[in-house]
């Protein structure tokens, strides 16, 4: 039989809801708090992500999703028309200037269309983009370096080196008319000097006449979404019949992904530990919200259980009772969720700038996200949590019989009652009361323990950040000094000079100092073909690799591979980490010992030991005065028409030197060439390299440590003044900078984690509050009876205080057990995610919460009982009926 009674059920829901306004306010507050938890979390996380992405984009030089490199006009047109490409912007670089005033931050001279200009943060705020002839637009800092006052129509003279696809050629000096400019962004990697298409085409035509290649045009694109950028771009190439992994195939369109997008970084580093961490965090948030609301509806059902029993006596079905509770929950959501959304978004928007101010990201890039995910996700999570939370109380109301309902006192009695002749003790009564509804007690204890466990985990997490590990990976010395070319990974004929090193040494107090040298002549180390194939396999297909190997010089199974040999003063050998062997032979005069520098992963492991020679092996190095490429078919020097597969290196003035591998070492990146390639990296003593290379060594860097903080501060001040200004030929790195970055990074986690702990702690306190309220509301009749037979208000209050203290101490004990169980597992997972994390077990935060919980366990019952005990015993008995 189908009875149309939905309207009646709806009226029952509304009327019963209206009859309990005070309790409804608590429920609305709980729903709003849950929504606030979700909204503030989503707002903070997405806003921090948006701000971090903006920071990364400015470091990269733009926010286009990716770049199709070196495209022809036809390829650009086809790619732009592909359905996956929302918008495209072309850029043609015609030259670069990296000397003189642009030595520290180079400038690129290029034509950009409107889209590319916008995506590269190069849209003029004053004036317009270049449109024809010798018009130019650039940032204000570049104008200042050139000695030009930012004023439209001003003449700007720029000298730059023409750059085609393969090389940097002759220098051009031209005077342009300034038609637009914008404020300089210090995070940008280069100064953009934008010229018109007409001028770019004219210069390209002149360059081609001199024998240069046509200039390279890159196509920046915005895709349908910022996820799986690599896969989307590869799909575009595949759909259009292009490949993307060859430098020489004319049908290959190489791709570059903007690593500023966190989604592209996440996809490349996605591992099971990270997935588990994210899933655990989301489950934690949902469970936290569940704990808030479940007790609220448990209170409602407990308070109205007699009402539901009466409804069942007049024919209301269990399904209808569930619907009544569910409708009440959804009606409360109509008020609580919007309030939580507004408050949560407001709190998140206020906290994001606070968090960013404590980090190196505080450079005007604060971005408050307005993503629909914040609001849609918060509403869905809140609704899911509410529906889950009211489902069990709904089942309880549906199952209760009218007779049971009249006797309901929030107890779940299953054990046989025992008589006692010792009399009732208040603490025993309180302890027994906790066992009357074990499920409620467990939920309250877990919710309180969860906040303490999270607080303890946060302290262990932040305390596990190893500054020593972090700083040592950033720099291996208190100070490293060289030229901008060195810090920008550019090869150069000269870096820091001996005279500059002497001046720095004379003005600083060093406990250890030394120079690292570069070899300026072509140098090669002979290695097995299998090892060299491993290197080239990262860049070439199997067919290309076979062709390449056939063009290299062989001696049996050995092949001549490129190398980077760095020479060190003897004092700097202490900076090497010896993994195998002994470096002491390198310190002996007239030695022929060499150390092979290996690459370790972030956790100090050697991933491919078979790639390197063994300690004790003899390895041959070949030094040459010059190297040229010939056509392997004719033996003559190659020409522009020679296909790359026939290029063959020919050495002039070559001489071999045999070395004995004395050790495998880790050479800190901060004192190395700072770039890698194919072939071995090796370390020799400065004297040995000078002897074997024919004197072709030049100082590359100077580093030193100081004895104490005072000497370090003096050196920092001196080097800061020495390298100040755009015209200074030197730059430096210091440990002080790395320490500051580490402190900012740590502070950010402290703030975000502290906010999360505060919210979850508030959840725990609310559940504590709700548990005590449940005990008082559902036991009003019991309390009135106890008072009627002689129990005083003071005794009742003391009993409730004991209950509060039992809750508090049980929560601390549960937090202690949870910390013991979860701590090592979380530490292992965090250690795999953060290479500079070292887990240290701690229980101090749990102990520090004991006084706080004891105070709350006493204070909350006192306040709540005083408020509830204002009525007389007769009134309480009447109300309880």
Per-region residue spans from a language model:
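Hydrophobic alpha-helical transmembrane signal-anchor segments
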Residues: 18, 23-46, 280, 287
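Hydrophobic transmembrane alpha-helices
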Residues: 34-35, 283-290, 384-385, 758-768, ...
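Interfacial "coupling" helices/loops that link adjacent transmembrane helices in transporter permeases
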Residues: 20, 291-332, 764-807
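Basic-flanked hydrophobic alpha-helices used for secretion and membrane insertion
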Residues: 46-265, 463, 470-753
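Selective transmembrane-helix segments that form parts of the transport pathway or gating/packing helices
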Residues: 325-342, 379, 414-419, 800-814
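N-terminal membrane-entry
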Residues: 268-285, 373, 743-760
